[in-house]
Amino acid sequence: MDSRVSGTTSNGETKPVCPGLEKAAEDGALQREQWSNKMEFLLSVAGEIIGLGNVWRFPYLCYKNGGGAFFIPYLIFLFTCGIPVFLLETALGQYTSQGGITAWRKICPIFEGIGYASQMIVTLLNIYYIIVLAWALFYLFSSFTIDLPWGSCRHDWNTERCVEFQRTNGSLNATAENATSPVIEFWERRVLKISEGIQHLGALRWELALCLLLAWVVCYFCIWKGVKSTGKVVYFTATFPYLMLVVLLIRGVTLPGAAQGIQFYLYPNLTRLWDPQVWMDAGTQIFFSFAICLGCLTALGSYNKYHNNCYRDSIALCFLNSGTSFVAGFAIFSILGFMSQEQGVPISEVAESGPGLAFIAYPRAVVMLPFSPLWACCFFFMVVLLGLDSQFVCVESLVTALVDMYPRVFRKKNRREVLILGVSVTSFLVGLVMLTEGGMYVFQLFDYYAASGMCLLFVAIFESFCVAWAYGAGRFYDNIEDMIGYRPWPLIKYCWLFLTPAVCTATFLFSLIKYTPLTYNKKYKYPWWGDALGWLLALSSMVCIPAWSCYKLSTLKGSFRERVRQLLCPAKDLPQGHREGPSAPATPRTSLLILTELEPHH
């Protein structure tokens, strides 16, 4: 018996309808939207998960951690953590038709703090991730010139130590001690105008502030009409980067020295597998790249039709994401191999990760190419699009969570647009501090602590525990079977029960043991209060889970067991099954609720 209200389609087929929809209609609230078609959902998720990390982090991690050998821990984490948690979050959103907070409230109220933790991470992510777009836009606009401004030392921002590195008979034309390249000076002295430390924030970089404003304006209009606008925008933002990546790949592999770069990228060094740091890097890359534990997948899945095959979609999207990362490595390291040969230096000296790759290594390589402004425009336009759809989907996740929490307030005409505007303006104003002369130090704090692998692993531990043990892995498998018509691969259930929490817990503890304070550029050490601020950012999300559980337990009446039992009960308006014909054998319940039922009730 399905507790949802039945609706009838034009062909007479009955489909589940959330009971809140009829109530919302009575309150004058707008009904919850759905994707117009499956492709909009797939492209939206692809746009979210396939971002900057695929281009500037995964290839470097492969090179750093043993080349082809890195795929062993990467694939282990993919199948034990990546795919299971990806499916868990997507199916949870589709089953409950709720955003990243209320979805957890529906299935297990005591773990509603998981939703608050993920949305806290997303809130911080919305503030600092878009800063990369501001930098990329600045570089993009600077590329519309005959001579790229980071290609020479003939500018006002260059110092006497600036040396133009060019190939002369296989060697560098300058070996001056402490020499710097025009690329680095453009990045640090023209773009950032970086100060001596975080305690010296300095003046606002108004050019970057205008780029940030432009990025937020574009982001706002991509999602201001909900999934109706988002679903149309992703047809371009999620597909065009692939065209750019293919163009850069073809150009890269045809350059001299490309084979050497690809060899460094893939050559297996199996001895690196004994280093625990390699396994930690593989695990954190999975969580970063798959956008899990952020509530984004739950929000996007909540707009699916109830009987959408979320299992097949999740598997396909996970392999698409990993495949994109793998191919991006060829595009990046073929260019770095060319750069290594042209400069006559080992590839280890030109290989970079993160902003260093996008704004130092690759621009330096582009200068060496014919028609360099064209390739610079292609690369930075790809960076903008990769970051843009990841950014506006994160904003959509936060907005969806707030709207579903307060539907009577925000699910009315123009209220949602005002909410998005409020989120955008607030995030823009807070983000301005990262565009000051000392803003790069603040950005690094957010990047290192706020959305770190440590925070994501912590949330993943509780997500898998909540679904597998508190709600019941068998019950959730029944829910998925009800939606898609068959049961997923049994191994995924055992991952939720045992492998995922065990692997995530081990990696989380290892990250705590191996913790090292943040440094910038391997030289600048943050003051003690800088590290304290970073830990405050990290704890702001992690503390939500235990704090919310304690709060809910303290507000209810009755014995401790009665309160726990009440908070373990899922919402009564969740669908209980629609299958017709003989029922399948009941799935054994693996739920903490069983323990509370041992106490007699009067």
Curated annotation (Swiss-Prot):
Topological category with respect to the lipid bilayer: Multi-pass membrane protein
Disulfide bonds: 153-162
Subcellular location: Cell membrane; Basolateral cell membrane
Topological domains annotated Cytoplasmic: 1-40, 549-602
Pfam families: SNF
Catalytic activity: 4-aminobutanoate(out) + chloride(out) + 2 Na(+)(out) = 4-aminobutanoate(in) + chloride(in) + 2 Na(+)(in); taurine(out) + chloride(out) + 2 Na(+)(out) = taurine(in) + chloride(in) + 2 Na(+)(in); beta-alanine(out) + chloride(out) + 2 Na(+)(out) = beta-alanine(in) + chloride(in) + 2 Na(+)(in); hypotaurine(out) + chloride(out) + 2 Na(+)(out) = hypotaurine(in) + chloride(in) + 2 Na(+)(in)
Modified residues (Phosphothreonine): 587
Residues bearing the modification Phosphoserine: 591
Extracellular side of membrane: 142-206
Membrane-spanning ranges: 41-61, 68-88, 121-141, 207-227, 233-253, 282-302, 319-339, 366-386, 418-438, 453-473, 490-510, 528-548
GO terms for MF: gamma-aminobutyric acid:sodium:chloride symporter activity
Chief location category: membrane
Residues bearing carbohydrate: 169, 173, 269
A cellular component term, taken from the record's GO annotations: basolateral plasma membrane
Keyword list, A-Z: Cell membrane, Disulfide bond, Glycoprotein, Membrane, Neurotransmitter transport, Phosphoprotein, Symport, Transmembrane, Transmembrane helix, Transport
Single GO biological process annotation from the record: amino acid import across plasma membrane
Lineage: superkingdom: Eukaryota
Family matches, as PANTHER family: SODIUM- AND CHLORIDE-DEPENDENT GABA TRANSPORTER 2, SODIUM/CHLORIDE DEPENDENT TRANSPORTER
Function summary: Mediates sodium- and chloride-dependent transport of gamma-aminobutyric acid (GABA). Can also mediate transport of beta-alanine, taurine and hypotaurine.
Family indicated by similarity: Belongs to the sodium:neurotransmitter symporter (SNF) (TC 2.A.22) family. SLC6A13 subfamily.
Protein name (record): Sodium- and chloride-dependent GABA transporter 2
Annotated organism of origin: Bos taurus
Gene: SLC6A13
